[in-house]
Amino acid sequence: EAFDYAFKDGSFTQAALIIKDGKLIYERYRGITDNEADILASTSSSNSDQSFYKDLLNQRDKDSLISSWSTAKSFTSFLIGIAIESGHINSINDYASNYIQEWSRDDRSSVTVKDLLDMRSGLVPICFNVSSGELGNCLNSSDSASGGNIVYANDQLTKCINRELATEGLKYPWYENGANEYINGSFVYSNCDTMVLGEIIFRATGQDIQTYADYNLFSKLNIEAFWWRDYELYGQSNGNYLAYCCLDSTASDFAKFGYMLLLGGISDG
């Protein structure tokens, strides 16, 4: 009954599993429905062809890759922990400017790795402007809270690094829709904060986040996962990996990661 509810038309659910005592005891999969494809086509700003979504998401099974979207942030945070354990990063209290040298000579030098992990960096959030096709400051709280749709921009990392610190006491449209003055240390959901964490891993370890995860995490869990990249030709690896989202893997492999977290970071094989 619970699975019937989870898979009802309009839920967009395509996979669900139950893990008990480390064992997979139930799983169900389905492709996208006609109604769901219609919804995607009618709300998308990039593709309004219903058949595109039906062809892309029509059949789902245990081997189908599923995109994590923002669940990838948990993987990035875990990799920061691995980098600390391996000595590449000293601690979460390190100044981010130790690795992002662009911040070392201005007020952004006070931002710590922990601030980025907690999304309390104080850096102005940026959003994708559909009309201009460019990234810029978010114009309202709703766009900011959704992550700004920066995934549509060709080069996301540069803009994420080049953000300025917000000024306490000023009103910003992205902070409570400009109704109240900004307070330092406030939580502001930000894809860019996590995108910068991916670059910190790259600069601290000398490996992009995909390569670092393949060896230090994915292989240990016996899973395969594939990170999306932006279109910056001279980035980390012919494109900068989107540390804040878009990690593709199977539902069962995602479950292995989740179960490992449930066990406090211990792999159950």
Label every model-predicted segment.
Residues 192, 198-199, 203-204, 210:
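Beta-propeller domains
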Residues 182, 190-194:
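Acidic/His-rich structured neighborhood in mature extracellular/periplasmic domains
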Residues 6-57:
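A short, well-structured edge-of-sheet supersecondary motif
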Residues 22, 49, 55, 65-92, ...:
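Active-site SXXK
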Residues 1-20, 219, 240, 262-269:
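Catalytic loop of the DD-peptidase/beta-lactamase superfamily, centered on the K-T-G motif
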Residues 21-33, 45-46, 118-123, 163, ...:
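Glycine-rich, acidic and aromatic/proline-enriched surface loops and short helix-turn segments
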Residues 56-57, 62, 67, 85-128, ...:
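Active-site helix/loop module of the DD-peptidase/beta-lactamase fold
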Residues 38-56, 97-98, 132-182, 207-226:
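Short, charged, amphipathic alpha-helices and their helix-cap/turn boundaries
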